[in-house]
Amino acid sequence: SMAYITKRGNSYSVRYTYQDEHGKSYDKWESFPTKEEATNRKKQIEHELAAGTFLIPSTVTVGEFLMDWLPKQCSKHKWAPKTYQSNLALIQNLIIPYIGEMQMQKLRPYHIEALYDTLSKTPCGQYVGGKRRDLSPKQQKRTLSGTTLHEVHQLLHNSFLLAVEWGI
């Protein structure tokens, strides 16, 4: 089993695939500020995977989990490209900027409530392609619709049900 290093912006990511106790495969990304740290981690992962001593990371973040979940859902339900894109946009623009760095294990219902509360006051188009935009005072008055908030709710509900199944 191999691990790969990718430069992402100012950091280096180690990408690898591991299997849980049920033989299910997961892709995992871990980020490091330097190439040296990433290289050391890559060697460690490959050694552990080969030796069978690899411990399944329980530090999966909301962002990592959702970006792992999305393509799997897409192929499972044979989504149209448009469905995939709209779900990706929800994740990148309305979820990751707010709770993406949180560990799944530490996420509690009140974090989700706080997210909905924040989103209900968030202007449309505050994030596009996962990047924050400067909005004019007029644009800032247009908040997200109830429909959009409901879509975020559905997506989180469906994906988190799966997280329970996956034992995250």
PLM features: residue spans?
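Intrinsic-disorder/low-complexity linker and hinge segments
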Residues: L49-V60
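Short, Lys/Arg-enriched alpha-helical recognition elements, typified by the DNA-recognition helix
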Residues: S58-V164
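Short, Arg/Lys-rich segments that mark the N-terminal edge of DNA/RNA- and chromatin-recognition modules
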Residues: S1-P33
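A short, charged, amphipathic alpha-helix used as a generic interaction element across diverse proteins
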Residues: P33-L49
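Residues that cap or initiate secondary-structure elements
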Residues: D20-H22, E36, C74, P123
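Short, intrinsically disordered, charge-balanced linker/junction segments flanking boundaries
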Residues: S1, A163-I168
